[in-house]
Amino acid sequence: MKFATCFLVSYVLVFLVLSVCKEVEAKELCNRIEDIDGNCDFEGEKGCLKFMTNKYKKERHVSCTCTNLYMLHKTKRFCDCKHRCSG
């Protein structure tokens, strides 16, 4: 009986800690948007992630999206990347 009680209490505590950590992690993402020459079809999200990682070395980017913007004489791509907020 003691073992079952300890098991249930530890299970509930682990569940609570994990659920709180998920909420904190979800709230700590910030966006950074940059415009780069070129087209998203060439490298897409991987190119945006590589550019952002090289430019902002202290930030760890989680994911990026790439959007093409067609102008008169050239195409630009907008990289919208999510990274963990500092502070």
Swiss-Prot record:
Example GO biological process term? Answer: signal transduction
Localization, UniProt: Secreted
Q: Got any disulfides in this one, which pairs?
A: 30-85, 40-66, 48-79, 64-81
Q: What is its main location?
A: secreted
Key words of the record: Antimicrobial, Disulfide bond, Fungicide, Plant defense, Secreted, Signal
Signal sequence, renumbered to the chain? 1-26
Q: Does the keyword Signal apply?
A: yes
The record ties this protein, via InterPro entries, to: SCRL
An annotated GO cellular component of this protein is: extracellular region
Extract the Pfam families matched here: SCRL
Domain of life, per UniProt, equals Eukaryota
Family assignment? Belongs to the DEFL family.
Protein name from the UniProt record = Putative defensin-like protein 231
Q: Which organism is it from?
A: Arabidopsis thaliana (Mouse-ear cress)
Q: What is the primary gene name for this protein?
A: SCRL25
